[in-house]
Amino acid sequence: MAEIIKVYKQTLPAIRFIGKKFDNFGGWNEMFANGWLGIIENIAGGPEVLYHMPNYGKDGDAFIGLERHKSGEPLEVWIGMFAPANTEVPEGFVYIDYPEGTNLGVCWIYGKESETHNPIGECAGKITNGGMEIVPDKDGAVWSFERCQCPRYTMPDDKGNVILDYCYFVK
């Protein structure tokens, strides 16, 4: 059974999310099938550049599944990667720029890959119980994301478990 093993605050450098926008979680299959994540990784400079982004480090080489939630509006899912600020955006992709100093509340969810999404609903409470305040955007929507970091999420440990990062934007 997967469980939340760590909760912490992380401050981002100026960073650019590059990806594709979907109306459901099924976009992951399309991203992999079309090689779109590889395109983003390459245009961002590859794993070596992503691993060494100032103030972001090893979290840089990760697939990101952004989610926008607002009552009365359809779910938005944006799948892609964070890249250094001002990275060129390939044609057909969308981007969101985050300024330096953007804060995240991060939960590490440890368990079998097939179970790591089960405790996501507990993350908001764990983050607020940790003294952080989740902040909506200017339109009142709450953004969160899963960060599938390599190798934390992609290489199971000796028990066959991985760590999925689940993040909210916080003050």
Describe each PLM feature range.
Residues 1-171:
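A solvent-exposed interaction/effector surface
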